[in-house]
Design a protein with these regions (language model features):
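A short, highly charged nucleic-acid-interacting micro-segment common to nuclease
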Residues: 85-101
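Well-ordered, non-membrane alpha-helical segments in soluble/globular domains
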Residues: 98-101, 163-167
Length: 243
């Protein structure tokens, strides 16, 4: 392994990979290299991989690289009092994890608005006791702090299974006040299908929907979110929904 001198940005990259498990090159570029060329981003990340702070995985030659925490990254964080685990191999459902981290990036690129973002795999370590585990819990300053629970649907679950999970949110979660449940899908067609089922079930809990690609492109503060309980709803911002 080569020896490198770490910058503050390097440390933030390593820390974020530890929390997020696996981040794509593009996700890291959006978070930490907004005005840097793709080649320069890859060079910076390769340097951290070669030094052992990160590990890299690529499903095939044409796939985007995934970056996780390496052994020297683990030692770096533990020296700062942060418990961390080296990432060995992406999970079988890596597409779902990448999608959740796309949500993370869409939230965290606006640091003045975000209060917190916790993915499902972080919640147990924070004392989450409910059997129902959302894909993410997001806190936003709108300007008052508001909490949103997030479900990311790739269309791989059956509709009865997903609707059954949504039904679990209807009565709320003890000790976890939340403004709304955000349903994020990969396609507009899937979102419309879910909206029809939400209306059919007659849910009272506010459920706001959007498409992941639009959220990634425009950010969490954009007017993207539709109230799925309504027929032909207008798109609004989360700030407007919190008023």
């Amino acid at each position: 392994m080569v020896s490198v001198r770490l910058s503050e940005r390097d440390i933030r990259v390593v820390s974020k990979c530890a929390v997020s498990k696996w981040l794509t090159t593009g996700q890291l570029a959006r978070l930490y290299f907004p005005k840097v060329t793709p080649d320069a981003v890859r060079k910076s990340l390769r340097r951290l991989v070669e030094a052992g702070f990160l590990v890299v995985h690529r499903e095939h030659q044409m796939a985007e690289a995934l970056h996780g925490l390496g052994p020297k990254g683990k030692a770096l964080l533990e020296a700062k009092g942060v418990t961390a685990e080296v990432t060995r191999k992406p999970p079988r459902q890596i597409e779902h994890m990448v999608g959740i981290n796309d949500l993370r990036v869409a939230v965290e690129v606006n640091p003045t608005q975000v209060a917190y973002f916790f993915a499902s795999w972080e919640l147990q370590g924070l004392g989450w006791v409910h059997p129902l585990i959302p894909d993410a819990v997001v806190g936003l300053r709108l300007p008052e702090r508001r909490t949103f629970l997030v479900e990311y649907d790739r269309g791989t679950e059956t509709l009865p299974t997903l609707v059954g999970k949504l039904r679990g949110y209807e009565g709320g979660l003890s000790g976890i006040p939340f403004r709304a449940l955000l349903l994020v899908t990969d396609t507009a067609a899937r979102l419309e299908t879910l909206a029809r089922h939400v209306r059919k079930e007659g849910f009272l809990r506010r459920m706001l929907g959007c498409v992941l690609a639009e959220l990634s492109a425009e950010g969490i503060d954009a007017a993207l979110f539709m109230d799925l309980r309504r027929i032909n709803p207008d798109k609004s911002t989360l700030r407007e929904s919190a008023e």
